[in-house]
Amino acid sequence: MKEAGQMQNLESARAGRSVSTQTGSMTGQIPRLSKVNLFTLLSLWMELFPAVEAQRQKSQKNEEGKHGPLGDNEEMTRVSTDKRQVKRTGLVVVKNMKIVGLHCSSEDLHAGQIALIKHGSRLKNCDLYFSRKPCSACLKMIVNAGVNRISYWPADPEISLLTEASSSEDAKLDAKAVERLKSNSRAHVCVLLQPLVCYMVQFVEETSYKCDFIQKITKTLPDANTDFYYECKQERIKEYEMLFLVSNEEMHKQILMTIGLENLCENPYFSNLRQNMKDLILLLATVASSVPNFKHFGFYCSNPEQINEIHNQSLPQEIARHCMVQARLLAYRTEDHKTGVGAVIWAEGKSRSCDGTGAMYFVGCGYNAFPVGSEYADFPHMDDKQKDREIRKFRYIIHAEQNALTFRCQEIKPEERSMIFVTKCPCDECVPLIKGAGIKQIYAGDVDVGKKKADISYMRFGELEGVSKFTWQLNPSEAYGLEQNEPERRENGVLRPVPQKEEQHQDKKLRLGIH
């Protein structure tokens, strides 16, 4: 019990230090996701990375409307729901509190093995966040590489103790081997789960519904049934609870005791642990629902002349959505009290690698924040409502795209296809940086395209040439169908139906997953 109490006190202290700036020293006025919880959520999300080859095949048919609700998750959850002993696992590699790797298991290799192949001796002094407790085969190599800390999600481990296909004896022997490796290594193998700060879940729910992607749907299709977002969220919650939680409390206690967490099996530690896990799953489901697989919406080329040319070069919609959710999670680390923005950069190599992400590999990520090392009172925090332009924040905030480029862990290679996913349209300050860095594709919302605000403008994005732009919109082919059947108008270059009399549309209800 003493160990459990010390762990909670330690993590509470860490939570207090990591809820703010890039240096973790500021306390803001809005709820913020701690870095530990961000890394944990990203590890869970990486476990759900779409199977690349299957998605490329499915992308050719993704407009036929054959999938049920949340059809984009069928392939993502196939491996996790399959009754196999080795569970698919997501992994986040962190060095100096910066993400340097996002990985997931492949058909041939575990996540820990992939990390060794990709990073090698560079894993020394890194922190690793697993979506499941790693097996002994992975742990021995990771420990040998000199990692600093290994954190894992305290549910069913990588060698499953729950599935019918697992050999109970083999799984327990592996768990014992893991404990022996843990007790005899210098690496700290632990559970890092922090309670969410006050009102965090409520804040995420409100901002997810108001985000550009959901609002674009409601603006483009004004006759939409607005319950679609909440229905999507409920489906995601059910799905993720089945994947990442152990519904039976006694079974959960048995797993915890088997994997060396018997000190967490007594209340209040056990009930607190389960509540923290449920809260994080709710948050993940909420954010994932903000970029939904809905009707014919997705990331498409805005220029009709380039649609046929660029289609074969674009990512499958499921992968594009997955990467955008990564950026949405990053946005909850923002230091901007008004607008949180997240950005993540990926690249695609010439050939498929051993990673579960296929040929794609992580390059860098960021969120909008004040300069590294700054304190809360060092810079102004006022927005354009402040008449005195000298004390506004816009001259001091580092944009998400800028942080992603600055702290990238890989070089951007001109011969490879690189892509950046941004939760909002890149502004005029960032567009030339993205092009100059050699990034080939931009995935973003287009709600602000062509707008000029008090302190920031979005004029260059629409005029940008030499970089493929895929914005969140109704599939242009579907928009063309609307053009043939209904009056239309254009909003940011996208066909939009003109609202008709309410009685003409009262029977039209949008359905989830028809994509």
UniProtKB/Swiss-Prot annotation:
It is an enzyme of class 3 (hydrolase). InterPro entries: APOBEC/CMP_deaminase_Zn-bd, CMP_dCMP_dom, Cytidine_deaminase-like, dCMP_deaminase-rel, Deoxycytidylate_deaminase_dom. Residues 1-11, 18-27 have a biased composition (Polar residues). One of its GO terms (molecular function) is protein homodimerization activity. Gene3D superfamilies: Cytidine Deaminase, domain 2. A motif (Nuclear export signal) lies at residues 272-284. A motif (Bipartite nuclear localization signal) lies at residues 489-511. The keyword Cytoplasm applies. Coiled coil: none annotated. It comes from the Eukaryota. GO terms for biological process: cytidine deamination; DNA cytosine deamination. PROSITE patterns: CYT_DCMP_DEAMINASES_1, CYT_DCMP_DEAMINASES_2. Residues 1-27, 56-83, 481-515 are annotated as: Disordered. Zn(2+) 1 binds at residues 110, 135, 138. This is Cytidine and dCMP deaminase domain-containing protein 1. It comes from Macaca fascicularis (Crab-eating macaque). The gene is CDADC1.
